[in-house]
């Protein structure tokens, strides 16, 4: 029974990282595309657009880091065993 729990934890860790990266990856691509479009329309607003973009990318990346933390806790501090 413990082997099944260990195997399920490894699979869940992989799914946690993979699924946690899908949403932010799509969001970051969309944000970067819109930032480039905004820069093409208004080059004089480059500083403001860049600052907002970097802040929003950091918030989106934090979701992926939370998925990584969940995966690491499933692998090394397994709460099910």
UniProtKB/Swiss-Prot annotation:
GO molecular function, one term: proton-transporting ATP synthase activity, rotational mechanism
CDD domains cross-referenced by the UniProt entry: ATP-synt_Fo_c_ATPH (cd18183)
A single cellular component GO annotation: chloroplast thylakoid membrane
Subcellular location as annotated: Plastid, Chloroplast thylakoid membrane
Membrane disposition: Multi-pass membrane protein
Membrane-crossing segments per the record: 3-23, 57-77
UniProt main location, coarse: plastid
UniProt keyword annotations, A-Z: ATP synthesis, CF(0), Chloroplast, Hydrogen ion transport, Ion transport, Lipid-binding, Membrane, Plastid, Thylakoid, Transmembrane, Transmembrane helix, Transport
Site (Reversibly protonated during proton transport): 61
Domain of life: Eukaryota
InterPro entries in the record: ATP_synth_csu_bac/chlpt, ATP_synth_F0_csu, ATP_synth_F0_csu_DDCD_BS, ATP_synth_F0_csu_sf, ATPase_proteolipid_c-like_dom, F/V-ATP_Csub_sf
Additional free-text comment from the UniProt record: In plastids the F-type ATPase is also known as CF(1)CF(0).
Family in the record: Belongs to the ATPase C chain family.
Function: F(1)F(0) ATP synthase produces ATP from ADP in the presence of a proton or sodium gradient. F-type ATPases consist of two structural domains, F(1) containing the extramembraneous catalytic core and F(0) containing the membrane proton channel, linked together by a central stalk and a peripheral stalk. During catalysis, ATP synthesis in the catalytic domain of F(1) is coupled via a rotary mechanism of the central stalk subunits to proton translocation.
Family annotation (PANTHER family): ATP SYNTHASE LIPID-BINDING PROTEIN, MITOCHONDRIAL, ATPASE PROTEIN 9
Complex formation: F-type ATPases have 2 components, F(1) - the catalytic core - and F(0) - the membrane proton channel. F(1) has five subunits: alpha(3), beta(3), gamma(1), delta(1), epsilon(1). F(0) has four main subunits: a(1), b(1), b'(1) and c(10-14). The alpha and beta chains form an alternating ring which encloses part of the gamma chain. F(1) is attached to F(0) by a central stalk formed by the gamma and epsilon chains, while a peripheral stalk is formed by the delta, b and b' chains.
Name by which UniProt lists this protein: ATP synthase subunit c, chloroplastic
Gene designation: atpH
């Amino acid at each position: 029974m413990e082997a099944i729990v260990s195997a399920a934890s490894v699979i869940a860790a992989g799914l946690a990282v993979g699924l946690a990266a899908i949403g932010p990856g799509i969001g970051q691509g969309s944000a970067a595309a819109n930032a480039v479009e905004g820069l093409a329309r208004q080059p004089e607003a480059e500083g403001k657009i860049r600052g907002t973009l970097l802040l929003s990318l950091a918030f989106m990346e934090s979701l992926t880091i939370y998925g990584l933390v969940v995966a690491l806790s499933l692998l090394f501090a397994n709460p099910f065993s």
